[in-house]
Design a protein with these regions (language model features):
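Short strand-connecting beta-turns/loops that link adjacent beta-strands
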Residues: 6, 60, 139-142
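A conserved helix-loop-beta module that forms one wall/lid of the active-site cleft
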Residues: 1-11
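Hydrophobic residue at the +6 position relative to the catalytic HRD Asp in the kinase catalytic loop
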Residues: 134-136
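Residues that act as N-cap/strand-start positions at coil-to-secondary-structure junctions
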Residues: 49, 130-131
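C-terminal active-site "lid" helix and adjoining low-complexity regulatory extension at the edge
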Residues: 110-115, 124-129, 138-184
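Phosphate-binding site of ATP-dependent enzymes
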Residues: 10-124
Length: 184
């Protein structure tokens, strides 16, 4: 269950039955405020060593991609502020339960399949996103499932440098081009 409260894995809870969902609401009904909106998302078994894939797009083109090993965590924000290499991120909720798993790991993914990139391009085009991320995973039964469309980017410079780019410079250049084009 994911509440309508932004990212950083905020208040996500794993449930496996309707009884568990009802128990979450009974235990803490205020967690879903102010709008009582939540998303019930299927948990998809996948190889934890492969993790998930996040592709960052800029102007409809792939900027770079990364593999993310979650270690069972839900805060997958790639910003070094949220998920530094030492695991002491600034985006954890103060009331969150302590997590005893290793920190989330981010690796450059230079061999992202062409088909995945093309689907990602179609998604960002359909969503009319100039800058954004798309996440997918490959299930244990071989399906590639795109499950998150991120309408902004939290760039991870260490991953982008493996692609030979500075992501911040690319975004600034893109925005300058947009401003110049709009001024004409």
């Amino acid at each position: 269950m994911k509440p309508d409260q932004g990212g950083s894995g905020a208040r996500i809870q794993v449930v496996s039955s309707w009884d568990e969902i009802e128990a979450v609401f009974a235990r803490d009904p205020n967690v879903w405020l102010p709008d009582n909106l939540f998303l019930l998302q299927e948990f998809l078994p996948h190889d934890p060593d492969q993790g998930i894939v996040r592709m960052e797009f800029l102007g409809g083109e792939l900027l770079y991609a990364m593999r993310v090993k979650t270690h069972g965590r839900f805060n997958l924000c790639p910003s070094p502020v949220c998920n530094p290499d030492d695991g002491e991120g600034a985006c954890e909720l103060p009331d969150a339960q302590p997590v005893s798993t290793p920190p989330v790991e981010f690796y450059p993914y230079l061999e992202v399949p062409r088909e995945a990139v093309e689907i990602g391009k179609r998604i960002v085009r359909a969503a009319r996103l100039d800058v954004g991320g798309i996440e997918y995973l490959e299930t244990d039964d071989g399906r590639r499932v795109f499950y998150d469309i991120i309408a902004n980017s939290n760039l991870r410079p260490s991953v982008a440098s493996a692609w030979g780019i500075d992501p911040f410079e690319r975004v600034v250049d893109f925005l300058v081009q947009q401003l110049v084009g709009a001024a004409r």
